[in-house]
């Protein structure tokens, strides 16, 4: 995920300030996705404020969706649904760590199973952002101990993502299969508690938190 965002930001930052969609060089690219993420392209991008924003077919998951959206709203993360043209090929959703915004591809939200998995996945990345100390940063941190993630999830992440991203993505992939993980983590993020007071940090996460002055030992 780190490498992905570096590529994405490189594409976005090398694009001139985009006043409107006509200046997008190509659709379904990092260029168009960067335009949407930077909120320079807003046509066919709408904000999701309730579970109904995704469609009435998601009623079976409305409680979980509502809990996640409530926590995201409390921590200042805006959620948007954008036209497929903005998203790089096969991108279903993303959390933009620099802007603390979440984006979902309109093309994929009609399926209740797909939507809830993507919401959990990207919501977990938000929780990882929170685990890094504060949302006012451009970093994310590992939350779970390695042994907590099944090997089949880790193997899938290694096959899908570059080595630098797979530890972060394996957690998010695991969370996508749970109806409590993302919901609970975001509730902690939105509470007065610190993430590392609830989730024991890994050695590397602890080292990062100490270096940044969030914990003393």
Predicted regions and their residues:
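A mature extracytoplasmic/lumenal domain signature
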Residues: 83-85, 106-108, 130-133
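Stable alpha-helical elements in mature extracytoplasmic
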Residues: 64, 68, 115, 119-122, ...
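Metalloprotease/metallohydrolase-associated module, dominated by Zn2+-dependent proteases
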Residues: 138-217
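Short pre-active-site segment immediately N-terminal to the catalytic Zn-binding motif
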Residues: 102-119
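Sec-dependent N-terminal signal peptides
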Residues: 4-13
